[in-house]
Amino acid sequence: MVYWITGRRNSGKTTLAYRLKAQIPGSVVLDGDEIRELWKMGFSDKDRVRHLQRITKMAKLLEGQGHTVIIACVSPKRLWRKHFQKQFKESLEICMPFGELWENTEFEEPEGKK
């Protein structure tokens, strides 16, 4: 299984990825920022596609070895995400568009609705 967490910069993708990792034994996190730093990639469309290709190849390798893979990566174009996600046996896309991650919150019914 591959979880693909996407969203804007600083939206909590990596935080969520590591929270999931703590709950899923044998899972591996691929952080887009860390991987980008390995190859000193730019941000042109060409560089972004190449970056996603590398992440996808690493994720496929890990998935093939039986790991659950959690990708935390800015992936701005839906077409690109869909193309790369088709290469996995099973995947789930998690979008974080607003830059918010709520933790340890409880839902309370509005007054009069209980």
What residue spans do the PLM features occupy?
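Small-molecule kinase domains that catalyze NTP-dependent phosphoryl transfer to phosphate-bearing small molecules
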Residues: 96-114
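Glycine-rich phosphate-binding loop used to anchor ATP phosphates in small-molecule kinases
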Residues: 44-101
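The conserved Walker
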Residues: 8-9, 14
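Conserved substrate/cofactor phosphate-moiety recognition/catalytic segment
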Residues: 14-65
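Hydrophobic anchor at the beta1->P-loop junction of P-loop NTPases
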Residues: 5
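Walker A (P-loop) ATP-phosphate-binding motif of ABC ATPase nucleotide-binding domains
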Residues: 2
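Short active-site-proximal "capping" loops at secondary-structure junctions
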Residues: 10, 34-37, 76-77
